């Protein structure tokens, strides 16, 4: 097995929205805001080479939205999903599986592209099976008013219409040790219904793709919960259990949205779970 970090683009969001009720004087220490109160964020995907499979976890925002749409998120840097794949020696048609942690636009936008004539949409990865789960799919296709702006039909429905969609089986246990893609999956409901957190056994390590359970290293303290979470009081125990397990088992936490800290470990302290070590992707993958 080989793992590759795939940078799909950098963007910015309001720091207050990213940290909920936590005062700016606190979160600004780890995630400094610009003059517009926005903080730097990444869309860092993970590519898994495993035998004959080439599995892409999440896809970033993609490039099919309008300039006005992207203007809201102040895109920065030169990263692009397809270009990042090429830099690793791959083409989009090589991808066999696309695993979507959830269907918010910054995680699944790159899964669907314009067709050649710009008259409609098509899946970006023609030879891939797309993986979601049934609970989350229904949640996203019949969205609540709060999340509706994050679940864009053009990112979601073409996947189903293509016939490439499959669902990861859920169970009564929130952690599946061995999914259809040969890695573990933790299901969490605080951010959105049945977000999926991959746990990948790699050499002698466990790599956890944290998605929006832990978007940045600045979100490690327990009360530091995003304002975007639909059930913040559920995020708290989910995050507490996860971080304690991560500290006890020395998990390597792959941060999808942290523009500056790629992979981290955490440790127990008198103040709770805190940052332990920071690694670049080249140190670990």
Please report, for each region that a protein language model flagged, where it lies by residue.
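Zn-dependent metallo-beta-lactamase
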Residues: 1-56, 61-65, 69-72, 172, ...
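Active-site metal-binding loops of divalent metal-dependent hydrolases
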Residues: 8-9, 59-62, 103, 135-136, ...
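Active-site beta-strand termini and strand-to-loop segments that position acidic
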Residues: 48-51, 199-203
């Amino acid at each position: 097995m080989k793992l590759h970090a795939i940078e799909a683009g950098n963007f910015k969001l309001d720091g207050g929205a990213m940290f909920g009720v936590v005062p700016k004087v606190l979160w600004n220490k780890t995630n400094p805001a610009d003059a517009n109160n926005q903080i730097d964020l990444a869309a860092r995907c993970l590519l898994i080479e495993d035998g004959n499979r080439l599995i892409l976890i999440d896809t970033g925002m993609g490039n099919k939205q309008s300039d006005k749409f992207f203007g809201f998120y102040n895109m920065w840097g030169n990263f692009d999903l397809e270009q990042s794949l090429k830099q690793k020696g791959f083409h989009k048609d090589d991808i066999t599986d696309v695993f979507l942690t959830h269907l918010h636009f910054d995680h699944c936008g790159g899964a669907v592209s314009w067709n050649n004539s710009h008259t409609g949409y098509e899946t970006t990865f023609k030879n891939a099976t797309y993986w979601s789960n049934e609970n989350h799919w229904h949640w996203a296709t019949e969205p609540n008013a709060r999340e509706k702006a994050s679940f864009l039909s053009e990112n979601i429905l073409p996947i189903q219409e293509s016939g490439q969609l499959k669902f990861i089986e859920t169970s009564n246990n929130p952690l599946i040790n061995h999914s259809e893609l040969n890695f573990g999956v933790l299901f969490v409901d605080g951010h959105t219904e049945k977000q999926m957190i991959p746990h990948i056994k790699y050499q002698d390590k466990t790599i956890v793709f944290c998605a929006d359970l832990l978007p940045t290293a600045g979100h490690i303290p327990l009360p530091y919960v995003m304002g975007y979470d639909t059930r913040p009081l559920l995020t708290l125990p989910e995050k507490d259990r996860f971080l304690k397990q991560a500290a006890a088992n020395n998990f390597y936490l792959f941060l999808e949205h942290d523009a500056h800290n790629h992979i981290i470990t955490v440790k127990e302290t008198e103040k709770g779970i805190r940052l332990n070590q920071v690694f670049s992707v080249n140190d670990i993958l």
